[in-house]
C-alpha cells in the first residue's frame, strides 16, 4: 500500500496509523520529506476521477491568494503541492488497482 500524506497534519498521521494496522508494508510518501513522482501523482488523480484542484485545501491562504478562480491542470497542481505541502487536503491511499482520497482517517479502510 502507498500513502501520499503530509506528516505535519494530525489527520494525515491518523490515516497512516490506521493504514499500518491493516497492512504491514506501507510505502510512505510524506510530501514534506520526499519529492513524489509526477507519474504517481498523475495516476492517483486520474484514478480518483477528480480535478486537480479537488484535492487541494481551499481554505489554505496560498490557495486563496494564488489559485482561487483558476483551474490548474494536473502538472501545475503537482508543482504547487510539492512546493506547498499544506495544499494537499487529505491523504491519498493506493493499493493494487484502487485509489482512495481519505477525507477522514477511516476512509483508508475502503482500500481493502
Regions found by a protein language model. Give the residues of each.
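Local sequence-structure signature of Cys/Sec-based thiol-disulfide redox active-site neighborhoods
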Residues: 1-21, 26-31
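Thiol/selenol-based redox catalytic cores and closely related redox-interacting motifs
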Residues: 31-111
Amino acid at each position: 500500500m502507498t500513502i501520499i500524506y503530509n506528516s505535519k497534519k494530525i489527520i494525515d498521521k491518523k490515516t497512516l496509523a490506521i493504514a499500518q494496522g491493516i497492512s504491514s508494508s506501507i510505502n510512505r510518501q510524506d510530501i514534506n520529506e520526499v519529492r513524489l513522482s509526477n507519474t504517481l501523482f498523475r495516476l492517483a488523480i486520474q484514478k480518483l476521477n477528480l480535478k486537480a484542484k479537488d484535492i487541494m485545501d481551499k481554505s489554505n491562504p496560498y490557495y486563496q491568494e494564488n489559485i482561487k478562480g483558476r483551474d490548474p491542470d494536473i502538472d501545475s497542481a503537482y508543482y504547487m503541492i510539492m512546493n506547498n505541502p499544506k495544499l494537499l487536503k487529505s491523504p491519498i491511499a493506493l493499493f493494487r488497482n484502487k485509489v482512495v482520497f481519505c477525507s477522514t482517517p477511516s476512509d483508508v479502510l475502503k482500500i481493502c
